[in-house]
């Protein structure tokens, strides 16, 4: 019974099995994946490129930064854009940032360019006979109650009045005198206190800064060329070397003032929350520590006095400008609010104590070195100040913020005595020096301290000592630029991406489509944090923004280059602008060349014939397109992109070969082309030519026949009559008696053929011939189609019967197999049951056997 039940349900199983097999086949076919090219994907890679600058310089101002920026920079964007990249993390390293090196080279170029047209002071490298200029102090009322006379009084020997001999071109030798600061002089003979020379005469070429040029820096923006972008980290507690979770993209940095200073960072950017401590390696005492403050500390610097400026001419267009002292000589100084400074040092000490794991932080003055390092050196309105900061860095703090050192009575402000140098060692390179001409009148500049540069005394932070001594440092201007560029990095945009899809390229006729120009460039990376599926929907917009950004930046660069052309001053920055322009065009053309080689010109999504290899990535489509960003996907397949590109190129070459062979057989590509109106017009023309040819031949032969008959005496114009000719023998009657003598159907013959009659006969015979042949051809075609249809139907019926037969055989085989299996299972089950029964009976009979054994034993 069970076998019969299985046989009855077999048909349902058979149907469900066939459906399952079909579904499996469909799924196996649907899993075929193909490489698809996407243009405009938000992907970038770290890169090094030539940056250009933008500024709002005014060319009519003589400030050196204005002149340099006017020649070198493009105007700033009046509406800068910053695009937040959601769900994007990026690694930054402020200590390995090529932007810092570029800015360092640019500031060197700024100073070199500002000194090129100025006077070289080589004629002054002579022996100077100098005497001290005695100065008197002013009273405390005029100087201010917070500063003592001793603090403002110029030390004896600080300023010297020197005389020397010069011989101008075309004139006799004459003696001149000039006033120099003691820091700018070197004593020649120790035994003679009056013989001096300028400090850099034996090592450097001294160039006097142009008298109408100042050194007040203006903000300069660094911008990336088209095809590149600048990533900005917006994490408020970013230490410079970690993974940033709040990333945005900008085309230019914020305005950076290239302030050249040591120990104290002036007029920079502030930390948004707490004070930030940054160092390449805090445990290495050779690495500087950069402190970014969260609040500014005002520093007010002044050079008092009624100094004047006088010129000493020693050649055509050459003059040395020296100081003319009028009245009292007073020392330059800077003042800082003591409360603000103590609060700043307290916060720095607490932060350093937690980072260095020290309980006591000691701030001490510089340990020695060049004046540029041992003092706070900076430029104030054209004069170079060297201020003693020992009063600033002279305290001890616990890591909880308590001050341990005995502070003197607070006067409200800290006064830093400053010295002024006119011969400056160029910080950027050796062998060069600059003479800063004196500035007349009182000089005052108000600046904001936004950071510190500190050095740690020798020893490792792992020492058992709980004390840590920190001193002011500096000298490497790269640290100044790092303090502003720490949150930026330059990346190269890679708009080409490949990913697997189910779409395969179809060979169809394509129309060329031009890619239009969009708006701005920065929106290109706006979809970087989106999944690949979401980002692929904006490829057109991103590709347009890429090209639009290139065009826009090229226009800006061209305007800057044109400005340099009419000034006839194509500087190093002008060359960089040309490089940026060429680089942007090359990047775009390179991408378009690859798209053209792959047969994807004018497309943002381009399918290919290349099957996706699971060894490249075995992720599922849903996982790729719904869970991954383009950046994550690019990192995963970065090792295989070269292989994929080669396969796409080879596939395109093979496709072009196939298309060429197909075009050679284009006329046979479709039977429907035979029935186009142009083809039928061609057929009609051929038919007319054939018919006309036949008629022409017939006419020629008729004329020849007529000529032949005329020669034989035949007249073609005589009237002839047509007589009926009998169809049978002449003795046969024309009718039949039973039929009432009805005449049979006969045909007439033409006794004499005329010219018109011959033409008519030929046309009639030709039409009849064509009709008969076409009718026969149609009948033959009908018979062939009928025969093929019948044979085809018979073949289909035969195949159907064969399929039914084999299906029935398979069905019978399956039923037989199931029957055999059921019988075998039943027999096996019976055997098992029987064995179990026997085993059970044996167990049940054990007591009986024991009893029988006892009975036999008793007998």
Swiss-Prot record:
**GO function term, MF aspect, one:** structural molecule activity
User: What about PTM?
Assistant: Highly glycosylated by host. The high number of glycan on the protein is reffered to as 'glycan shield' because it contributes to hide protein sequence from adaptive immune system.
Top-level taxon of origin: Viruses
Q: Which residues lie on this side of the membrane: Cytoplasmic?
A: 708-859
Please report any disulfide bonds recorded for this protein chain, giving both cysteine positions.
Answer: 53-73, 118-210, 125-201, 130-162, 223-252, 233-244, 301-334, 380-445, 387-418, 600-606
Record-stated family: Belongs to the HIV-1 env protein family.
- Indicate what this protein is called per its UniProt record: Envelope glycoprotein gp160
Q: Tell me the organism.
A: Human immunodeficiency virus type 1 group M subtype A (isolate MAL) (HIV-1)
């Amino acid at each position: 019974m069970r076998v019969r039940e299985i046989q009855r349900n077999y048909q349902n199983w058979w149907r469900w099995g066939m459906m399952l097999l079909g579904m499996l086949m469909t799924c196996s076919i649907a899993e075929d994946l193909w490489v698809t090219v996407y243009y405009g994907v938000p992907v970038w890679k770290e890169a090094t490129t030539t940056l250009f600058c933008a500024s709002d310089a005014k060319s009519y101002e003589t400030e050196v930064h204005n002149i340099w920026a006017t020649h070198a920079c493009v105007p700033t964007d009046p509406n800068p854009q910053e695009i937040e990249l959601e769900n994007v993390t990026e690694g930054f390293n402020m200590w390995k940032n090529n932007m810092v090196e570029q800015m360092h080279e640019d500031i060197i170029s700024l100073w070199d360019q500002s000194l090129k047209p100025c006077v070289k002071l080589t004629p002054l490298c002579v022996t100077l006979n100098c005497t001290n200029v005695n100065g008197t102090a002013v009273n405390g009322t005029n100087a201010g109650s917070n500063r003592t006379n001793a603090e403002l009084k110029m030390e004896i020997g600080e300023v010297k009045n020197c005389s020397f001999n010069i011989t101008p071109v075309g004139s006799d030798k004459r003696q001149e005198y000039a006033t120099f600061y003691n820091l700018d002089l070197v004593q020649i003979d120790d035994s003679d206190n009056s013989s001096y020379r300028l400090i850099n005469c034996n090592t450097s070429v001294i160039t006097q800064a142009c008298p109408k040029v100042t050194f007040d820096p203006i903000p300069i923006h660094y911008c990336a060329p088209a095809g590149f972008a600048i990533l900005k980290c917006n994490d408020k507690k970013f230490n410079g070397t970690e993974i940033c979770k709040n990333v945005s993209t900008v085309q230019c940095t914020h305005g950076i003032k290239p302030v050249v200073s040591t120990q104290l960072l002036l007029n920079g950017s502030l930390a948004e929350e707490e004070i930030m401590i940054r160092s390449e390696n805090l445990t290495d005492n050779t690495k500087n520590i950069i402190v970014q403050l969260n609040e500014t500390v005002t520093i007010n610097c002044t050079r008092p006095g009624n100094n004047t400026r006088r010129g000493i001419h020693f050649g055509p267009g050459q003059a040395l400008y020296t100081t003319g002292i009028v009245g009292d000589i007073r020392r330059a100084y800077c003042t800082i609010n003591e409360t603000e400074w103590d609060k700043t040092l307290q916060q720095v000490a607490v932060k350093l104590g937690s980072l260095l794991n020290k309980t006591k932080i000691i701030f001490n003055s510089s340990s020695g070195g060049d004046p540029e390092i041992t003092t706070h050196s900076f430029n104030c309105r054209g004069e170079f100040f060297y201020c003693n900061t020992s009063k600033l860095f002279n305290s001890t703090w616990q890591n909880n913020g308590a001050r341990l050192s005995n502070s003197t009575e607070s006067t409200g402000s800290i006064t830093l005595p400053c010295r002024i140098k006119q011969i400056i060692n160029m910080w950027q390179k050796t062998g060069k020096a600059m003479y800063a001409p004196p500035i007349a009148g009182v000089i005052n500049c108000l600046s904001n301290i936004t950071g510190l540069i500190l050095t740690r005394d020798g020893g490792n932070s792992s020492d058992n000592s709980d004390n840590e001594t920190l001193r002011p440092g500096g000298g490497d201007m790269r640290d100044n630029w790092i303090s502003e560029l720490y949150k930026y990095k330059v990346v190269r945009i890679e708009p080409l991406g490949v990913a697997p899809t189910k779409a395969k390229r179809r060979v169809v006729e394509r129309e060329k489509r031009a890619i239009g120009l969009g708006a701005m460039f920065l929106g290109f990376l706006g979809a970087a944090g989106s999944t690949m599926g979401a980002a692929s929907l904006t490829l057109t917009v991103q590709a347009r923004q890429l090209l639009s950004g290139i065009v826009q930046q090229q226009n800006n660069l061209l305007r800057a280059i044109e400005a340099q052309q009419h000034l006839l001053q194509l500087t190093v920055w002008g060359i960089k602008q040309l490089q940026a322009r060429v680089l942007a065009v090359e990047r775009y053309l390179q991408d378009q060349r690859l798209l053209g080689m792959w047969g994807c010109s004018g497309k943002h999504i381009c399918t290919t014939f290349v099957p996706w290899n699971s060894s490249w990535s075995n992720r599922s489509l849903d996982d790729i397109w719904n869970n991954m960003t383009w950046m994550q996907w690019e990192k995963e397949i970065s090792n295989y992109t070269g292989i994929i590109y080669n396969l796409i190129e080879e596939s395109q070459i093979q496709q072009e070969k196939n298309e060429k062979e197909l075009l050679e057989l284009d006329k046979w590509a479709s039977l429907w082309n035979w029935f186009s109106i142009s083809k039928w017009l061609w057929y009609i023309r051929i038919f007319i030519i054939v018919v006309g040819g036949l008629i022409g031949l017939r006419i020629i032969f008729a004329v020849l026949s007529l000529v032949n008959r005329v020669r034989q005496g035949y007249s073609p114009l005589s009237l002839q009559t047509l007589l009926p000719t009998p169809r049978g023998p002449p003795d046969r009657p024309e009718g039949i008696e039973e039929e009432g003598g009805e005449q049979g159907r006969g045909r007439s013959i033409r006794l004499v053929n005329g010219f018109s009659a011959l033409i008519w006969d030929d046309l009639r015979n030709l039409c009849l011939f064509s009709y008969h042949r076409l009718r026969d051809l149609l009948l033959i075609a009908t018979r062939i189609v009928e025969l093929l249809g019948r044979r085809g139907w018979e073949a289909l019926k035969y195949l159907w019967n064969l399929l039914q037969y084999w299906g029935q055989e398979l069905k019978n085989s399956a039923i037989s197999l199931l029957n055999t299996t059921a019988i075998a299972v039943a027999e096996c089950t019976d055997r098992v049951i029987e064995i179990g029964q026997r085993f059970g009976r044996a167990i049940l009979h054990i007591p009986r056997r024991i009893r029988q054994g006892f009975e036999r034993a008793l007998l």
